[in-house]
Amino acid sequence: MKYLTTIMLVAFLNSTVMTKEIKTTIQINASPEKVWSILTNFENYPKCNPFIKSIKGNVKVGNKITARIEPPGAKGMTFKPRILAYETNKELKWLGNLWFSGLFDGEHIFELIDNGNGTTTFIQREKFKGLLVPMFKKMLDINSLNGFDNMNKKLKELAEHE
């Protein structure tokens, strides 16, 4: 009974207290096709992406890739997320974790919305959950959010001036 109570408490905390979402949005004066071609040109990430420095591997649903992020003002990290969604010109989503699932998991989503007038709304968000999330909330609110913003601005610049 004690074991069951502990499991239920951890599950409750993991679904409420131990969650965090950060989200950024930017309007880009370019078609979703143009934005997508830049977003998924992973070979150029080291020189063109100020936040995600590299993505290696076959970016296909179900596959694991290797990604390196370098948030401004924070230590960079390399991790191996699994691709959850890849819908051309619309969405790329992966799920990564620190050491094991439930400790610090991040579901990263890039979403492109066709505004129907030659422009795109680009949404970048990440849903974090796990036991360590409360310890990293400040870093997520500042460093990761700034990294998202920097990446979004660079994507906009590249899409609008290429």
What function would you assign to each model-found segment?
Residues 4, 14-56, 60, 150:
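Hydrophobic ligand-binding cavity/cleft-lining segments
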Residues 1-8:
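Sec-dependent signal peptide recognition
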Residues 25-29, 68, 82, 111:
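Generic structural detector for well-ordered beta-strands
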Residues 43-78, 86-89:
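Short beta-edge strand/loop motif at the mouth of beta-sheet-based domains
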Residues 121-123, 127-162:
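A conserved amphipathic terminal alpha-helix motif
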Residues 56, 73-119, 127-129:
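Hydrophobic-ligand binding "helix-grip"
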Residues 34-39, 45, 65-67, 83, ...:
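Hydrophobic pocket/interface hotspot
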